[in-house]
Amino acid sequence: MPVLTDPVQLLQALIRCPSITPNEAGALSILEQFLRKMGFSVERPIFSDKNTADVENLYAKMGNKGPHLMFAGHSDVVPPGELDNWMYPPFEGIINQGKIYGRGAVDMKGAIACFIAALARVLEKQPIKGAVSLLITGDEEGPAINGTVKLLKWAAQKGEKWNAAIVGEPTSVKRVGDMIKIGRRGSISGIITVKGRQGHVAFPERAANPLPLAHKLIQALTDTALDQGTKNFQASNLELTTIDTGNSATNIIPAQTVIRFNIRYNDLWTKEALIAEIEKRLALVHSENNSNQYPYYQLEWIQNLGSVFLIKNDHLIEILSNAIEIVTGKRPECSTSGGTSDARFIKDYCPVVEFGLPGNTMHMVDECVTLDAMESLTVIYERFIIDFFA
């Protein structure tokens, strides 16, 4: 069994578990073995939902009284892609020239290993004056239906309450500790289906081409910026992700066009206000095109991606920032950039910050992390844990 205080040995063991969402593949079993040896109680609830795979999760806790700190993360990883493109096999955890290679090294088995090693180092020196829990899901890289959101609810129903949480997502950029996340933009997706009538291009009067209306709808979505950004957030942006007619022929007017888009929005918007704005823009085109007849459009919203949030707990941010400065000599940038994470669920239960390894190789071929970065993150986590319970 790897040494508890060595994050690299634990990371190697975790990488060797091919835990592609939603497969547990032994990763949670390794964590359970480690955590029980450290004195944690461990539970592994499995959650299910319609049309989704069952997902096993892990909740471990040590202590009962005093401040309660949660570390949240995920043991699942994205697929490695073509194995021949990798310098080393993605599920072997090979170390070469000061780097450990493997899928999940950065996102985010590395941070899990660092936090556990940091806690083991603290416990070698002093007891924890409070409670520590680890909330690890196997459904972060997937639909995120049977993971953190249900694990939080399950734990809360058992009476669990947390004072603060840290999520080990790879927030650092060039070096460990140069950036932490104190909030995230919201995310919402939409699908516009423009219905037409299929026909021969030589007889347009017998058909209804959906593409001209689709073009006008796209213009309505993209011609005017949503905003210019705020003090804590960059500008909201709407991005088209697909435009599809399902038609490869040059002599057929298509029957429909499907437009998919995503919006990342800042704190100038609520989800409801943003939906109203988009629907208003489209409605202007809708009426102009007499859309009670072909062609016409239908709009569907996908709303489970997370709302905008900003953590205003200065004490938590200060503890983490001070720990980073003590170890690295520099204070971190507090940012809200990037995509969504499971922090969007945790913020409904307690203040949450995100901090982990540099993410420049996450989801890429030859994903890797330096051994120096692993040690730096472990030392910072150790300092953070000590100061949190001081």
Swiss-Prot record:
Binds 2 Zn(2+) or Co(2+) ions per subunit. One of its GO terms (molecular function) is zinc ion binding. Disulfide bonds: none annotated. Pfam families: M20_dimer, Peptidase_M20. Zn(2+) 2 binds at D107, E141, H363. Gene3D superfamilies: 3.30.70.360, Zn peptidases. Catalyzes the hydrolysis of N-succinyl-L,L-diaminopimelic acid (SDAP), forming succinate and LL-2,6-diaminopimelate (DAP), an intermediate involved in the bacterial biosynthesis of lysine and meso-diaminopimelic acid, an essential component of bacterial cell walls. Homodimer. This is Succinyl-diaminopimelate desuccinylase.
